[in-house]
From Swiss-Prot:
The lineage of its organism: Bacteria, Thermotogati, Deinococcota, Deinococci, Deinococcales. Part of the ribosomal stalk of the 50S ribosomal subunit. Interacts with L10 and the large rRNA to form the base of the stalk. L10 forms an elongated spine to which L12 dimers bind in a sequential fashion forming a multimeric L10(L12)X complex. Contacts the CTC protein (RL25). Belongs to the universal ribosomal protein uL11 family. This is Large ribosomal subunit protein uL11. One or more lysine residues are methylated. Gene3D superfamilies: Ribosomal protein L11, C-terminal domain, Ribosomal protein L11/L12, N-terminal domain. It comes from Deinococcus radiodurans (strain ATCC 13939 / DSM 20539 / JCM 16871 / CCUG 27074 / LMG 4051 / NBRC 15346 / NCIMB 9279 / VKM B-1422 / R1).
Length: 144
């Protein structure tokens, strides 16, 4: 078992990681090979389009590293599905978009590996709640 020097969590555009900030300084402070990480990350996420990919990088004392990519943030998936640039600054008053229940279920299925929900329905309710907090109206569904 290798000794862990540090764990770094970043959100990077898929296939477009560069040694510039935030990647360089975050990995540089642990002495990890920045170019090696950017090449490996870009190769692994090249097929994900322009999504933002959360990544957890574990850096070991011998300067080697491993990383785990996760599914895109829920807010990104909701904005993409609703076709909006950003959520509402006043979600209880100003609504900025609409999602139907099928879109909510699709996002829930995408996020299922990263959510600690017991079922797709529970995950869908989590997605619907996040959408509402962003000022996106959810139409249909079990409690519409």
């Amino acid at each position: 078992m290798k000794k862990v020097a540090g764990i770094v969590k970043l959100q990077l555009p898929a296939g477009k990681a560069t040694p510039a900030p935030p990647v360089g300084p975050a990995l540089g402070q642990y002495g990890a090979n920045i170019m090696e990480f950017t090449k490996a990350f870009n190769a692994q996420t090249a097929d994900k389009g322009d999504a933002i990919i959360p990544v957890e990088i574990t850096i070991y004392a011998d300067r080697s590293f491993t990383f785990i990519t996760k599914t895109p943030p829920m807010s990104y998936l909701i904005r993409k599905a609703a076709g909006i640039g950003k959520g509402s600054s006043t979600p209880n008053k100003a609504k900025v978009g609409k999602l139907n229940w099928d879109q909510v279920l699709e996002i829930a299925k995408t996020k299922m590996p990263d959510l600690n929900a017991g079922s797709v329905e529970a995950a869908a309710n989590t997605v619907a709640g996040t959408a509402r907090s962003m000022g996106v109206t959810v139409e249909g569904g079990p409690n519409a």
